[in-house]
From Swiss-Prot:
Main location: cytoplasm
Any one GO cellular component localisation term in the record: cytosol
Domain TRAM: 378-440
Subunit structure: Monomer.
Localization, UniProt: Cytoplasm
Cofactor(s) needed for function: [4Fe-4S] cluster
InterPro entries (alphabetical): Elp3/MiaA/NifB-like_rSAM, Methylthiotransferase, Methylthiotransferase_CS, Methylthiotransferase_N, Methylthiotransferase_N_sf, MiaB_methiolase, rSAM, rSAM_horseshoe
Species this chain originates from: Ruegeria sp. (strain TM1040) (Silicibacter sp.)
Protein name, as recorded: tRNA-2-methylthio-N(6)-dimethylallyladenosine synthase
Amino acid sequence: MSAPKKLYIKTYGCQMNVYDSERMAETLGGQGYVETQTPDDADMILLNTCHIREKAAEKVYSELGRFKGLKAEKPDLKIGVAGCVAQAEGEEIMRRQPLVDLVVGPQSYHRLPEMEAKAGTGEKVLDTDFPEEDKFEKLKRRPKAKRGPTAFLTVQEGCDKFCAFCVVPYTRGAEVSRPVDRVLREAEDLVERGVREITLLGQNVNAYHGAGPNGDMTLAQLIWELDKIDGLERIRFTTSHPNDMMDDLIEAHGTCKKLMPYLHLPVQAGSDKILKRMNRSHTAESYIRLIERIRAARPDILISGDFIVGFPEETEEDFQATLDLVEEVKYGTAYSFKYSTRPGTPAAERAQVDPKEADDRLQRLQAVLTRQQREVQDSMVGRELGVLFEKAGRFAGQMVGKSDYLHAVHVADCDAKIGDLRRVRIVSSGANSLAGELID
């Protein structure tokens, strides 16, 4: 029997890319590939890329440049670029980096076996189509090998919102939702492999409308179906749009015990002028009222958000409106970025904010968000939380897991095993994690 071929995958960007990388590795496993943690001994290298920000795209070209020596030493080494940079830039990748053998978009990776075979003959292969066939239907059922206690599961892809700053509609395509039975089957397979927590993924996941036995089902209805799976203890979902936060989903946060009290609900800005120019289709006030309704259903829910500062034509007054919104909502965690021009998006054609001013605003916003995050973490001290243990800690006898609220929790002298869901009393908080002790 010949030795297995080795596959190195490097993943950039969002959780969906993590999921896609897993599926690509499984797909190429049928061609005799096993994963390796280093590119040096790989027979094939795949970079699964992100195109949300300019720096993310440039990192890919920088990484490819580092493989030139490796390709010279191993001419048969196959190098591929997948994901959203592949979709957006296509042939340009091969022009800038001729060492690349194949380029595959996020809707085409089910065809990787055929692409890999063609690349093995010396042919340059490009596949960035939006095929009519459903890639999930073409992917093989996931393997039965044991895995860690948490998993991502893509249920929806693409976006129809066309925010003025965003490339997702162009790189991932229109919104599509997977049929309910396919999602449930994959979830059951994951639970059989040891998974106890599943995070449902979508670029606009709460717009989910997958086909069910009696017509399309909402995300809330899908969650209630997942709730019936024995052995699945926790359900999360990300990322959501405020306009698709429907009543039944809000209600599920208050009544479904498996749905965790954590919600990532980006707002991007607090100025109605900027929100309109972003094409967000909601106002700051409607977002705040929505948060109030969600907290009425689940008072202890932790809200997470995304923010962009320095969006074209943003004034100091506009930025102050964002700070005001942050102070009113009080986020448990949030992600903030300086606006990054993406070619082909409407915002790229508008008057840009001075970079130094944008940097200053980002620092000021992050200071407020960091304070709020620490206040929320400090409020956990003394509470008893459920913790799903995921890995051993850095110190002997230490275990690390995630709380209901997605905080990392470190427990010393811990007899819990990976995959155990235990009650923990929080005894202290740090900058990015909590420390606790087992109470059962």
